[in-house]
Regions:
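Divalent metal-coordination and catalytic microenvironments
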Residues: 60, 117, 131, 178, ...
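Short acidic/polar capping segments at secondary-structure boundaries
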Residues: 76, 132-135, 142-143, 166-168, ...
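Class I SAM-dependent methyltransferase SAM-binding "motif I" and its flanking Rossmann-like core
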Residues: 133-174
Length: 265
């Protein structure tokens, strides 16, 4: 099921004062938007107490230099992320500021994972990965999610497994193998490592990641849970799996865990 390229009719109302899920912007305005959402995504992860060991990253493809992407500068805690704290990563891994001047650094694995994933997925704007309390333990089972909860239905028809022992991604080739495993799905469970999500917007990738973590928790706590039928899961997926749902999850997370979104500006 393609959740990046399309959207089914949503049964949910819009959010007052928020641009529509499918809003069209100029490239310059889109760059501003993606960077802001990326910084807020890191804030959401920080509020979840993720990334406190420097593990994890959220990328945002630049809409002007489309083979470049934004990551949080090395050494900045997720909970302190700002738009100005993001740096631009060139295809060869060189880190520059918005004017192209060398600056900062990024998590090495961040480049090795996100560069090949975004290169392999021109439909994806963002990818998200960090080590979490439930996603990492579940990944050690080397098994996909089953339809044992409502949220699981967002992924059961749109997930993949990276069955490899390369838990420390020290090479670009390692990232290419992850990209190949991800394929065109929105979730890849990385063996003994954790979760990786991709989306057609930063909001979508972050929303999917947080939901996938909740699904992983259910799987760890109810490993023998009885799954609903594929037919029933498909009915639920019709509204839970579209890209607009990942975006909507982000809106709720922003309202729930970030007291003042302007803090990233």
């Amino acid at each position: 099921m393609d959740t990046i390229g399309g959207m089914s009719e949503s049964p949910y109302p819009t959010f007052p004062g928020v641009e529509a899920f499918d809003a069209v912007r100029t490239p310059e305005a889109e760059r501003v938007h993606r960077k802001r959402m990326c910084a807020l995504g890191y804030r959401i992860f920080g509020a979840m107490r993720w990334g406190q060991l420097g593990d994890g990253h959220i990328s945002a493809r630049d809409p002007i230099l489309t083979d470049h992407f934004w990551l949080l500068d090395w050494g900045i805690p997720f909970a302190n992320a700002t738009v100005d704290g993001l740096v631009l990563v060139e295809p060869d891994g060189r880190v520059v500021d918005a004017d192209g001047n060398p600056t900062g650094a990024v998590n090495t694995a961040g480049y090795n994972i996100h560069a090949p994933v975004l290169a392999a997925r021109p439909d994806a704007v963002s990818a998200a990965h960090t080590h979490t309390q439930w996603g990492t333990p579940w990944s050690a089972n080397v098994a996909p999610f089953r339809a044992i909860s409502q949220e699981s239905c967002a992924f059961v028809f749109d997930q993949s497994l990276f069955d490899d022992e390369e838990v420390e991604v020290l090479s670009y080739d390692g990232g290419k193998r992850i990209a190949a495993a991800l394929g065109d799905s929105k979730l890849c469970i990385l063996r003994n490592h954790g979760l990786l999500t991709a989306g057609g917007s930063v909001e979508e990738a972050v929303g999917w990641f947080v939901m996938a973590e909740r699904v992983a928790e259910v799987h760890v706590k109810a490993p023998d849970g009885v799954a609903i039928s594929d037919t029933a899961a498909g009915v639920a997926a019709a509204t839970l799996a579209p890209a607009s749902t990942g975006w909507r999850l982000f809106q709720w997370l922003l309202r729930s865990v970030v007291d003042d979104p302007s803090i990233v500006d």
